[in-house]
Amino acid sequence: MPIRIPDNLPARKTLESEGVVVMDSSRAARQDIRPLQIGLLNLMPNKERTETQFSRLIGATPLQVDLTLVRITDHQSKHTSEDYLKTFYKTWEEVREQKFDGFIVTGAPIANIPFDQLRYWPEMLDIMNWTQTNVHHTMFICWGAQAALHHFHDARRYRMPAKAFGVFRHQILNPRSPWLRGFSDSPMVPVSRYNDIDRTSLGPDLEILIDNPEIGVCLLDDPKHRAVHMLNHLEYDNRSLADEYERDVKAGLDTPVPANLYPDGNPIAEPENHWRSHAHLLFQNWINEIYQTTPYDMAQIGR
C-alpha cells in the first residue's frame, strides 16, 4: 500500500522517481480500510530532505499510511521558509488533540546545548508526555532519543572524546525482537554524534537491542513507554554523511573523513550505501508491529 503525504509536497517527485507509491486524498478515500496515522516531528534544519528520507522508508511498507508533518509551535526555522512550513506542516499545538498510531521524533543539530537550556525544551517535555496518552508507539531518533531517555529514565548523556562519524558495524543483542526481524548479525549503521548515553545509567526496563562497544548504544526497546530509541541514523540517504563532511571542510573544521563510507576511504568517490536494507527492515517491522497492536478505534489509543 502507498503513503499519503500532503498534496504538492516537493518530496513527492523524489519518492515517485524511486518507485515509492504515493497516494492522493481521493484515491485513499476509495479504499475501505483505516490507514495508519503516523506523525513526524521534524527537528532537522533541512526539512525537505528529512521528510523525504522518512517518507521513503514508511512508504515502502505494505500498509496504507497517512503521514502528518509536525513542527515545534514557537520556533522560527532558519533554513526553511515560513510559507513552506505553513503549507505542509502542522504545529504541535494544532495536533495535540489528535491520536496517532505511530509518531517519530527526529534528531536535531543541538548536541552542545544542555536540555534545560534549549528554548523549546518546555514544549519538548509536553510532547514527550503527550506521546504517553495520544500515541500508540513512538520512535525517538538521535537527539530525540537522548532527550527521551533523559526525560523518561534520567539517563546520563556525556560528551565523547571525539565525534563518532561514519558507518560502523554493530552487534544484534536480541535477534528475537520484533523490531529486528530479518536483520543480519552485524548490520552497518550510519553514526553522526558527539554524545553518547552512559549505559550504566540505563535501568532494567530498557533493553539494548543493537550495540557497538566502542561507538555506543544504537537501539533500545522501551516497552514501558511504548517506544524505541534509535541513537543513530538508519534513515540517512547515500549522501547525508558526505554532505555533512563537505560542509565542515568548507567551514574550515577539522572533521575526519567519515569511516567506512567511501570506497577505499577516498572522499572524492561516491559514497557506498551499506545500510539501506536494514533501514527498510527497521521501519517495516515498526509499521507492522503498530498495525498488529494498535486499536482499530483510535479513541482507545493511550488508554
What are these regions (language model features)?
Residues T73-K86:
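N-terminal beta-loop-helix "entrance" segment that forms/cooperates
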